From Swiss-Prot:
Molecular function in Gene Ontology: aryl-alcohol dehydrogenase (NAD+) activity; metal ion binding
Cofactor comment: Binds 2 Zn(2+) ions per subunit.
UniProt keyword annotations, A-Z: Aromatic hydrocarbons catabolism, Metal-binding, NAD, Oxidoreductase, Zinc
Entry protein name: Aryl-alcohol dehydrogenase
Assembly, per entry: Homodimer.
Similarity comment text for this entry: Belongs to the zinc-containing alcohol dehydrogenase family.
The reaction(s) this protein catalyses: an aromatic primary alcohol + NAD(+) = an aromatic aldehyde + NADH + H(+)
GO biological process terms, semicolon-separated: catabolic process
Amino acid sequence: SELKDIIAAVTPCKGADFELQALKIRQPQGDEVLVKXXATGM
């Protein structure tokens, strides 16, 4: 699968502070879901 550069909000656990990281991941396959979030006011 082709890898894409994705900017993702990474957090160690629910409710924790998150940091934006550039991740190299593949496109979702089958029933996988890639969640995209847009951050505002940053």
